[in-house]
Design a protein with these regions (language model features):
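C-terminal substrate-binding/active-site "lid" region of AdoMet-derived donor-dependent transferases
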Residues: 124-176
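S-adenosyl-L-methionine
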Residues: 1-43, 82-110
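A short SAM/SAH-binding and catalytic strip from SAM-dependent methyltransferases
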Residues: 113-127
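Conserved class I S-adenosyl-L-methionine
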Residues: 44-54
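Conserved SAM-binding loop of SAM-dependent methyltransferases across substrates and taxa
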Residues: 55-67
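Conserved SAM-binding motif I beta-strand of class I
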Residues: 70-75
Length: 176
C-alpha cells in the first residue's frame, strides 16, 4: 500500500513540477491540431520534436497524417507520459515512428528536427529561449501556440476563428 502512495506522490509531484516550470498538461484541441496539420508540409524521413508533449496527442496526429516522419516528444509529467506510452503500446504498428521520452524540455537538442512544437505558457519563454540557443537547426520551423515568443518576429502567424493563434519561427533566430 505504501508503494502505491509513493507512486501517486511521485506522479503528482511530476505534474506540479511540469506546471510550474513550463505548463500544466493541457492537450491541444482536435480542431487546433487539424488546423495546424493542414498547414504542415513534411517529407518522409523528416523529424518533428514536441517539447512538453504531454500525452503525445500532437505527435500521434502528426504520425497518422505523415507516417514516414519521425516524431519525438519530451515531458517530465508522468501521468500524461504514461497515457502516451500506453497509446504507443496499444497501437505500436500505427505509431512505430513515435518516440515518447521522459526528459526536461529545457535540456533537449533539436539540431536534427525539421519542426519543433512549443505549446507552453509564456512565463517559461525566457528560460526556453536561453536553453534553445544553438540547439535548433537554422532551417527548422519552430511552431508556438497561443503566445508569441518575446521580442522575436514570427515568419508567419496562423489565425482561425475559435482557435488559438499559432506563430511560426525559423530556426535561425536561435543561432545568435
Amino acid at each position: 500500500m505504501i508503494v502505491l502512495w509513493i507512486f501517486l506522490l511521485v506522479v503528482l509531484l511530476s505534474a506540479a513540477l511540469a506546471g510550474l516550470s513550463a505548463a500544466p498538461w493541457l492537450p491541444t484541441l482536435p480542431s487546433q491540431r487539424k488546423h495546424l496539420l493542414d498547414q504542415l508540409k513534411l517529407q518522409p524521413g523528416q523529424t518533428v520534436v514536441d517539447l512538453g508533449c504531454g500525452d503525445g496527442s500532437m505527435l500521434f496526429a502528426v504520425a497518422r497524417r505523415f507516417p514516414e516522419v519521425i516524431c519525438t516528444g519530451y515531458d517530465i509529467s508522468l501521468l500524461p507520459l504514461f497515457i502516451a506510452w500506453g497509446r504507443k503500446l496499444l497501437f505500436f504498428k500505427t505509431y512505430k515512428n513515435v518516440h515518447i521520452r521522459f526528459g526536461d524540455l529545457f535540456k533537449q537538442d533539436c539540431q536534427n528536427a525539421n519542426i519543433v512544437f512549443i505549446f507552453l505558457l509564456s512565463k517559461c519563454y525566457p528560460k526556453l529561449l536561453t536553453s534553445l540557443k544553438g540547439k535548433v537547426a537554422p532551417n527548422a520551423q519552430v511552431i508556438v501556440e497561443a503566445w508569441p515568443l518575446p521580442n522575436l518576429e514570427p515568419q508567419e502567424t496562423l489565425k482561425a476563428e475559435g482557435l488559438l493563434p499559432v506563430y511560426i519561427y525559423t530556426g535561425t533566430i536561435f543561432r545568435a
